[in-house]
Amino acid sequence: MSIKAEYIWIDGTQPTAKLRSKTKILSDGSRLPRWGFDGSSTNQAEGHASDLVLEPVFSCPDPIRGGDHLLVLCEVLHTDLTPHPSNTRALLRPVAERFAGQEPIFGIEQEYTFLKGDRPLGFPEGGGYPAPQADYYCGVGADAIFGREIVEKHLDLCLAAGLGLSGINAEVMPGQWEFQVGALPPLEVSDHMWVARWLLHRVAEEFGVTASLDAKPAKGDWNGAGAHTNFSTRAMREGYDPIITACEALGQDDKPLEHVRQYGTGIEDRLTGAHETAPWDAYSYGASDRGASVRIPWQVEVEKKGYIEDRRPNANVDPYVVTRLMVDTCCTELARREQI
């Protein structure tokens, strides 16, 4: 029986990478071979040396095609099998391995916005604006919710693929939604997030809309779209002092700027200090504070153990990058203080 394997990879588009995919027919799904592609057509190579390599790193059932068909997430390599500069997964791998003993795990909240043409779904066609933000967040009813049928289909597809989704909800702006992935280790949560994003774009195709990860899809008094990143280590899940250490590590010296510069395109447009954000150029942390850079959830403060939420990453952040930065910054300081 022939198997359709959809090879998925992250391209070299700047400033925000896009997903690409193509189908390989296999006689046996137990072995996923390397494959190649034209990097000159994906912003990853020039025409005179355009061959690049797809290295399978994660696979799951293809919930769209069904049967034994597969989705295959790949790293991009040069023909000498060294990582391509666009391959951010290769940079995460050694960091994840170095700090694996601290058992870091992540839950990432992926916000996104459905667009019909260049306007959010739910905005009046032909111009104008809907009612101000108030009733849309976790709302119900045709006057508040736009695109639920797409969201539900995406959720079903992700679960059928075995991805680690943990929930969905409507967000603050019309046509804006969120799904959550995790809690999982850094490589796994990032792999699952990229495949879930691919499925989101793929199912949106069928409904004639675009699933945008733009950080500020509607200018003015409308919420932006983020990827709030929840993080803990074993020590943080067992005590409060390591939680404070992690929060302080993220604010040390030039760490705030180092992080936000890599937290997605359009960070200054979204992190303004309004709409449940902290200013992009100021660092803060606090319990239950959605206006802080990093939030300590209320139950964590009460129980004196748990996790933290970095609220700065944009919806278009690369999960391989944000997990690498947080593991490196927090786990290095936790190790220095022997809070492991």
Curated annotation (Swiss-Prot):
Pfam families: Gln-synt_C (PF00120), Gln-synt_N (PF03951)
Residues given in the record as Mg(2+) binding sites: 109, 111, 171, 178
Gene3D superfamilies linked: Glutamine synthetase, N-terminal domain, Glutamine synthetase/guanido kinase, catalytic domain
Binding site for L-glutamate: 276
Catalytic activity: L-glutamate + NH4(+) + ATP = L-glutamine + ADP + phosphate + H(+)
Main localization (coarse): cytoplasm
Enzyme class per UniProt: ligase
Residue span(s) of domain GS beta-grasp: 3-82
Cofactor: Mg(2+)
GO terms, biological process: glutamine biosynthetic process
Subcellular location: Cytoplasm
InterPro entries: Gln_syn_GlnII (IPR048091), Gln_synt_N (IPR008147), Gln_synt_N_sf (IPR036651), Gln_synth/guanido_kin_cat_dom (IPR014746), Gln_synth_cat_dom (IPR008146), Gln_synth_gly_rich_site (IPR027303), Gln_synth_N_conserv_site (IPR027302), Glutamine_Synthetase (IPR050292)
Keyword terms: ATP-binding, Cytoplasm, Ligase, Magnesium, Metal-binding, Nucleotide-binding
Domain GS catalytic stretches: 88-340
Known partners and oligomeric status: Homooctamer and homotetramer.
Protein name: Glutamine synthetase
